Amino acid sequence: TGCAHLSDYPFQEYKISKFDTSTQKRAIAKTDMLKFTETSQPIGQKKYVELSKDIFIFSYLCGGINFTDIANLTQENIVNGRLHYIRQKTGKLIKIGIPQEAMQIIKKYTDESNGYLFPILNVKVHKTALQKQNRIHKIRGKVNDILKTLGKRLGIEANITTYVARHSFASVLKKSGVNIALISEALGHSDLATTQIYLDSFDNEQVDEAMKNLL
């Protein structure tokens, strides 16, 4: 992208409100995350319910990896028991350990993954970038619908989507005392400011709790 002089800006006389960099709180507690590992409630197609839960838990366990990156994972992304992948949103290389529970999820789909770790894309069907993009968009929508339904049935107030797993990963680490720089590295953020936006709402929540003890 090139740079333009201020004089070239056609809307210079208009005042535009500053973009709000705060992010909606989308994390859930560790106890709520665990509910997704224990439930086996029937909702629609069992195949997609199981896949939705597994993707949600896998993301939480593997550094909050997002849905698009999960969909594109292949066996080549596993290096010496660690997950190595380029985050599509930032182009940053992420290297993170794969917990045993996450490895078990991967193994579950070995026979039906069609060239990928998860049965979302198929190397024989989704060949162009547009085909992959459309497929990912479609399955992500289906997965999120199932997660929302599951969340309600489990009595979780938050609106559950795949992105909640990413925020929850950051939240649980923060509350466990993990350094923000390490959390930022795991999330693949380009700077600490982005990570701080993620974590500010959690800090506010803790302040609210602390203020209840003022009197």
Describe the residue ranges of each PLM region.
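N-terminal DNA-binding recognition helix of tyrosine site-specific recombinases/integrases
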Residues: 1-10
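Conserved tyrosine-mediated DNA breakage-rejoining catalytic core shared by Y-recombinases
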Residues: 13, 62, 72-108, 123
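Long, amphipathic, Lys/Arg-enriched alpha-helical "connector/arm" segment
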Residues: 16-50
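Catalytic-site neighborhood detector that most strongly recognizes the C-terminal catalytic loop/helix
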Residues: 27, 87-91, 123, 187-212
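Active-site/catalytic core of tyrosine-dependent DNA strand-transfer enzymes
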Residues: 33-34, 99-157
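Short, basic (Lys/Arg/His-rich) helix/loop patches that form interaction surfaces
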Residues: 38-47, 111, 144-185
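Short, polar N-cap/turn motifs at the start of nucleic acid-interacting alpha helices
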Residues: 76-82, 157-158, 178-197
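DNA/chromatin major-groove-contacting recognition/catalytic segments
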Residues: 95-100, 104, 108-109, 200-215
